[in-house]
């Protein structure tokens, strides 16, 4: 799933470490999400959106897997 996490984080002037601490996750988790190698849990996705004051769909872009009906 694509996301705008890096863009939002950098706009706030935050490091990956600072964001990780604020969200209660590791820096490696932030790196993996930003690179699209890890899709966060729904709970974490909502925490990220809430942290930045945006809607979840403003952070995460669902591209679909071609199996939608």
Model-derived features with residue positions:
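Key DNA-contact positions within bacterial/archaeal DNA-binding proteins
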Residues: 17, 28, 57
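Short basic helix-loop element that most often maps to the first helix and adjoining turn
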Residues: 4-22
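Recognition helix of helix-turn-helix/homeodomain-like DNA-binding domains
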Residues: 25-38
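Short, conserved catalytic or interaction motifs in soluble domains
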Residues: 35, 54, 64
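Short, charged recognition helix plus adjacent turn
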Residues: 50, 60-69
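DNA major-groove recognition helix of helix-turn-helix/homeodomain DNA-binding modules
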Residues: 43-58
